A protein has these predicted regions:
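Positively charged n-region of N-terminal signal peptides that target proteins for export
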Residues: 1-3
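N-terminal signal peptide c-region/cleavage motif recognized by signal peptidases
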Residues: 13-16
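OB-fold ssDNA-binding interfaces and closely related basic DNA-contact patches used
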Residues: 19-87, 92
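Short beta-strand/loop turn elements enriched in aromatics
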Residues: 84-108
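Acidic, glycine-rich flexible loop segments
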Residues: 99-155
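Short, solvent-exposed mixed-charge patches
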Residues: 158-160
Length: 160
């Protein structure tokens, strides 16, 4: 009888144990149709309080004048919403087309999150940051190698 109860209990618990882990700001992630987000990820989450835009170019020593590189970056700074998380900055790097998109990563002794976006998204992101309401940066690294990063805004009430 005891073994039967244990078996029934485990069969009832199994779906709950396999369910997706709930974390702050889950509602901003897209659906997970392939079930890749099952474990509890390392999460970075902070509210953006200010930002700055940098447009720069660089010619490396010994390079020819036509080999200069240019770039656009937004530096977002704010306040962490997770206890113990030192990450309160994100550098959004914009690249032409989709070339050179890299997974979100931590730099500068793990205090700055770097996210790469296509340059075509810069106007949309600037508009989002300039709109009223709170904005947040989020990154999640799952044990299976899945990496999610985003910039999202708090829900807004629509003007009618």
């Amino acid at each position: 009888m005891r073994a039967w109860l244990l078996g029934v209990g485990l069969s009832l618990l199994a779906p709950l144990l396999a369910a997706q882990v709930s974390l702050p700001h889950d509602e901003y992630l897209p659906a997970d149709p392939f079930g890749q987000r099952q474990d509890k990820p390392e999460q970075v989450l902070f509210e953006v309080q200010r930002y700055s835009l940098t447009v720069g170019s660089e010619l490396r020593p010994g390079g020819r004048p036509n080999q200069a590189e240019a770039g656009v970056w937004l530096l977002l700074e704010g306040r962490s919403l997770l206890a113990g998380s030192p990450v309160e900055r994100a550098r959004l790097h914009f690249v032409e087309g989709g070339a050179g998109l890299r997974a979100a990563r931590l730099e500068d002794d793990a205090n700055t999150l770097v996210i790469t976006y296509p340059l075509s998204l810069l106007p949309v992101i600037r508009q989002q940051l300039d709109a009223p309401g709170a904005d947040y940066v989020q990154r999640r690294f799952y044990g299976n190698g899945l990496i999610w990063a985003d910039l999202h805004s708090a829900p807004q009430s629509g003007a009618r």
